């Protein structure tokens, strides 16, 4: 429980920035699950996600070794000293499926599939781990910040917006932040 005095700085009704990151509403029926065998590491899925719940992550060997058991990784194309994973915050996802729709996949098979939220609840621990890792500036420099692939390795400043599922406006706002 919180005492009323904890809210004295917010008597005017303001809310601090970034608090949506703690909501974890779990409102989607189905959420994307990543299949690395079909991934070409284009990052289009992260690019179109209105809520920034799906993110590419470059991991050092040490970070990959310390990852929660079961987290899937690939060698990062073009930078073999890093591992690559596509991390999904299932509890922040709205289930719109934009990421799956845009995924080119490999050999006719997509790298993302929508699966039941309850069945994929374990995926949240991977996101919770990767979101705390530092941004790799050398990865952004290699893939260029002005490209779809490179831009998605940066932490978005507009995340978990709460907009309607599949909103077409928030990806643009997310991108310019």
Give each language-model segment a name.
Residues 1-93, 100-174:
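Ferredoxin-type iron-sulfur electron-transfer modules and their immediate structural context
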């Amino acid at each position: 429980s919180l005492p009323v005095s904890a809210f004295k700085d917010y008597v005017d009704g303001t809310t601090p920035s970034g608090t949506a990151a703690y909501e974890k509403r779990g409102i989607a029926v189905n959420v994307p699950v990543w299949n690395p065998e079909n991934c070409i590491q284009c990052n289009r899925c992260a690019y179109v996600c209105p809520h920034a719940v799906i993110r590419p992550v470059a991991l050092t060997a040490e970070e990959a070794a310390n990852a929660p058991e079961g987290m899937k990784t690939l060698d990062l194309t073009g930078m073999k000293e890093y591992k690559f994973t596509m991390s999904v915050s299932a509890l922040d996802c709205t289930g719109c499926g934009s990421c799956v729709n845009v995924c080119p996949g490999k050999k006719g098979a997509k790298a993302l599939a929508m699966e039941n939220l309850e069945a994929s609840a374990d995926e949240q621990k991977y996101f919770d781990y990767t979101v705390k890792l530092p941004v790799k500036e050398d990865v952004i420099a290699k893939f260029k910040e002005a490209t779809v692939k490179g831009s998605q390795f940066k932490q978005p400043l507009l995340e978990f917006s709460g907009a309607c599922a599949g909103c077409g406006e928030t990806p643009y706002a997310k991108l310019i932040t």
